[in-house]
A protein has these predicted regions:
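Short glycine/proline- and charge-enriched loop/turn segments
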Residues: 1-4, 101-107
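Alpha-helical packing segments of well-folded alpha/beta enzyme cores
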Residues: 17, 121, 146-150
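C-terminal helix-rich "cap/oligomerization" subdomain common to oxidoreductases
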Residues: 55, 109-110, 126-169
Length: 169
């Protein structure tokens, strides 16, 4: 690992569940608490544990690490049941994803047909260039909001405290 290259687990893998939480809850977090494990030799963050606090008492928490078994799973738990998705990222284009839905009456697994998600991302990006504002996302606003949360994570780890996203300009 090389700190001068700007990597680290927060940038390399933590960005995905941060973005997914924002998408799933269709809102921005009010604040974060982040704990990074820094490699003593390289000074690069190799593990991250993060709690994001959204409105309406909604929370998102996750852990990522270079030396952890690869899982890439999501779980959502609510008062009426739960959803879980296996192999959410970096899924081979021929592998189906599995969505599990559970509550007191249902225990169902839905196979999601394989798709090349990298191809879909590139196509969406190219389509936005060719036909501006054709995508449901405002890419510029989304990137700025994501950067704000990532910065709040870094400050939270450095200062060992909960950081409200409104603190970040």
């Amino acid at each position: 690992y090389d700190k001068s290259l700007g990597g680290g687990i927060l940038n390399d893998a933590g960005c995905y569940p941060i973005n997914a939480s924002r998408m799933l809850f269709d809102s921005e977090p009010r604040g974060v608490f982040c704990n990074l494990t820094i490699d003593k030799e390289t000074q690069v963050d190799t593990k991250a544990t993060l709690l994001m606090d959204f409105n309406d008492n909604i929370k998102s928490q996750f852990s990522v690490g270079y030396d952890l078994d690869y899982q890439s799973n999501y779980g959502l738990w609510g008062s009426d049941g739960s959803l879980s998705l296996t192999r959410s990222y970096n899924i081979p284009p021929d592998m189906p994803a599995r969505l599990n839905i559970k509550n007191s009456n249902i225990d169902e697994e839905i196979l999601i047909e394989p798709v090349n998600h990298f191809q879909l991302m590139v196509e969406s990006f190219c389509n936005e260039i060719m036909k501006p504002n054709s995508c449901i996302y405002n890419f510029e606003e989304d990137l700025l909001n994501q950067a704000k949360i990532m910065e709040a994570c870094r400050i939270s780890d450095k200062e060992k405290r909960y950081v409200e996203t409104r603190e970040i300009e």
